[in-house]
Amino acid sequence: MDLLCWMAFGARVLAETAAVLGQAPEASKYTSIAAHLSDAQNLDRLHYDEDSGQYRDWGRHTEDVGLEWRVVQEEGQPSSRQELLRVRERGGREPVLQHVPHFGYVSLFPLMMRLVDPGSEALGEQLRQLQNPDHLWTDYGLRSLSRSSSLYNADNTEHDRPYWRSAIWINMNYLVLAALHHYGLAPGPHREAAARLHDRL
């Protein structure tokens, strides 16, 4: 989902750049691409989970995985070395196509890239969940992953700390802040809530 949002944003930037440079055919082409990628109905159809009120990635997912040490085999024999592997637990559920149930920065990309319709209930829900301290809100900015996520503060691998699984990133907070400013000026039922949230963040 984040890639779709970045591509929509990138196409808008290219369209604006081409227009400034007086390259009308390119501006028209990228405007068309941006409109296609920014289609709010398509975004909602693909990524909005009505039950949670969140935008979510879609893919093959299971919660039944973990990191496990295994002895490395060398020339068919166990060695003294071990490696950490991501494994599915025995008897655990196979990955299935579904919305990935982890609320974090990825969930905010439609908001950050200003793809959510200012009049939509989805925007109101994003604003409500954004300020929930059990999810992302802290006194120091928005954390990268909800505290309720099973992956919160969990290592990716032995040497890969959970940078995107709890930490507060100023660049992402800036994108959210800029989006809140945008929605705080846009006509719609959530204008005042977005402006208040902008001031708090």
Spans of model-derived segments:
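Short intrinsically disordered, low-complexity coil segments enriched in acidic
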Residues: 1-7, 126-130, 200
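Short helix-adjacent coil turns
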Residues: 21-25, 184-185, 189
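Aromatic- and histidine-enriched alpha-helix N-cap/loop-to-helix transition segments
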Residues: 1-9, 101-105, 164-178
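Catalytic cores of carbohydrate-active enzymes
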Residues: 8-118, 198-201
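Substrate-binding cleft of carbohydrate-active enzyme catalytic domains
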Residues: 2, 111, 190
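C-terminal structured "cap/appendage" subdomains that terminate the fold
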Residues: 187-201
